[in-house]
């Protein structure tokens, strides 16, 4: 089954989108992310690419990013948690701690509003053909299952496990991460 998403590689000059095949049906695709602009920008880029191919794209993220998303001509729907905390230096210091930061994000930012995130995503995916979510969006697979729509988890986080052959570089343990690469998939 094709959802109209096609990856293209080109070694020559780019082919204008108007000259590309348009045999794919128009789809409504919801992309969801939370966190900093570094977390959001990959989904904005995907949304712009899909929009250029005539798909309806919705970025579902924190309310604090509404103006940025809508200024690009991309659909926006709010999903909690709102990421306005990224502008608070005290909160950022706490969640960027090399040892405890990730745990704090999960325990203090994501899990307390998991039910609200689920409810917001249920509303955002109304009529959607596909849900694309960041790895740490725990409500996404539940929403996709409830709605009966396909779900894709996109991983762009440097600490995420992208491959059994390429373990992540752990903050504060760069040397250890590099030295464990010889283990390959055993690590």
Where do the PLM segments sit?
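Conserved nucleotide-sugar donor-interacting segment of glycosyltransferase catalytic cores
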Residues: 112-182
